[in-house]
Amino acid sequence: MAHKKAGGSTRNGRDSNPKYLGVKRYGGEFVKAGTIIIRQRGTKTHPGVNVGCGKDHTLFALKDGTVKFHTGGALNRKFVSIEE
């Protein structure tokens, strides 16, 4: 009786696609309204003046201007702002 036992399932058989997170426009760069500045998971960097935050925590420019990174607030958080 030639039988083959069922193979066990593997735990490693997957490889997720890259998410392309990170800073897209750096400090000092001129951006137009709607330009994505940072793609991130959670608010590692918070939106400052003239910067909006999407539902996936993407930070984007609300007005044309120059990107500026800075820290501040009571908890010394990282912020990104747009200077007109």
Curated annotation (Swiss-Prot):
<comment type="similarity">
    <text>Belongs to the bacterial ribosomal protein bL27 family.</text>
</comment>
<keyword id="KW-0687">Ribonucleoprotein</keyword>
<dbReference type="GO" id="GO:0003735">
    <property type="term" value="F:structural constituent of ribosome"/>
</dbReference>
<protein>
    <recommendedName>
        <fullName>Large ribosomal subunit protein bL27</fullName>
    </recommendedName>
</protein>
<dbReference type="GO" id="GO:0022625">
    <property type="term" value="C:cytosolic large ribosomal subunit"/>
</dbReference>
<keyword id="KW-0689">Ribosomal protein</keyword>
<dbReference type="InterPro" id="IPR001684">
    <property type="entry name" value="Ribosomal_bL27"/>
</dbReference>
<dbReference type="InterPro" id="IPR018261">
    <property type="entry name" value="Ribosomal_bL27_CS"/>
</dbReference>
<dbReference type="GO" id="GO:0006412">
    <property type="term" value="P:translation"/>
</dbReference>
<feature type="region of interest" description="Disordered">
    <location>
        <begin position="1"/>
        <end position="20"/>
    </location>
</feature>
<dbReference type="Pfam" id="PF01016">
    <property type="entry name" value="Ribosomal_L27"/>
</dbReference>
